[in-house]
Amino acid sequence: AGLATSQWQALATSLINDFVYKGVSEYVAWYESALQVNAVTELLNTATQRERALVTRVEKGDLANVVLTEFKANILQQRLLLAELKQKRDAHAQMLSFYWRSPKGDMLIVDEANPPKDINWPFWVGNGQLMTLRNALRNHPELDVMKLEQQVVNNKAALASNALLPKLDLKASVARDIGSGPSNLDGTETKVGLSFSYPLGNRKAKAEQAQLQSKQRELEHKLTSTEQAITQRFEQALVYWGQARDIVALQSENAALAKTLSKVEKTRFDAGDSDMFVLNARAQNEIKAQIQEIKAKVDLLKAELTLYKEAAMLHSLNN
């Protein structure tokens, strides 16, 4: 009963770990989409204000109407992008409500349009956390379940081996002679006997023992393979996390540069030193760069989350 309880506890830990991973993954997916919607909306509002200024210039004859048409076409592309991002954001918000529940278990409505400024991310990773996560691999619930299964099989194998052993019984009996013959005996007589028996049907017992020994070898191999697989998954997640940190730095630099170039191009256009084609290209690059920067930052969160997931440490949130 104790082994069965321990097995269920290890299995429950594994299930909770997977459930938390899916829920938090859905949260960061919604968070990414919501941030991207806000970024594009802000740029689109700025572009709309600029459109009004261009309309005024066209009406005054300072600017050709075709220039305004090109600008409107660019704004339309931004609005289409915004609509797609909103669709993605709302879909993730709907999925998130399945995981986001009240203490009573009721699904909560997610305010999909207003992501928090600080999500208080609990899964950040540093050198100390990496050491803790590595140590946790030895107590992974997948391994615990298999070790407990091994223990059950080992116990059965021990019982099967004992069943094949011959049985020795030492018996002692005491008798008193109360006969009436001429040589009547007084007192008692003690007899000692040794009984040796070998269990019948030992072929069946041997077959059962061989089957259990085969199961022991199978579980040992499976345990070793699982340990290696868990370690490999963690190491892969660690490599991805390191790369994600580098990409965040590069994408942030790229976004800042794209913003500067777009601002410079607007100044050049107003001075008559640039055309609408280049201006639109700079604006599109700025939007793409901001979207990629947000994606890179959220990818880093996902990478940290994966490290905790592979170490089976997500269940600790419930403790």
Can you annotate each of these PLM segments?
Residues 15, 19-40, 49, 92, ...:
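Amphipathic alpha-helical coiled-coil segments
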Residues 119-125, 164-167, 183-194, 230, ...:
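A glycine-rich, aromatic-flanked flexible loop/lid motif
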Residues 67-70, 102-170, 317-319:
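Amphipathic alpha-helical coiled-coil scaffold segments and their short linker/junction regions
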Residues 15-132, 240, 244, 285-286, ...:
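Periplasmic alpha-helical coiled-coil/stalk elements that build and connect Gram-negative outer-membrane
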Residues 1-15, 154, 163-190, 197-210, ...:
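Small/polar (Gly/Ser/Thr/Ala-rich) solvent-exposed segments
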Residues 85, 141, 296:
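Metallo-beta-lactamase
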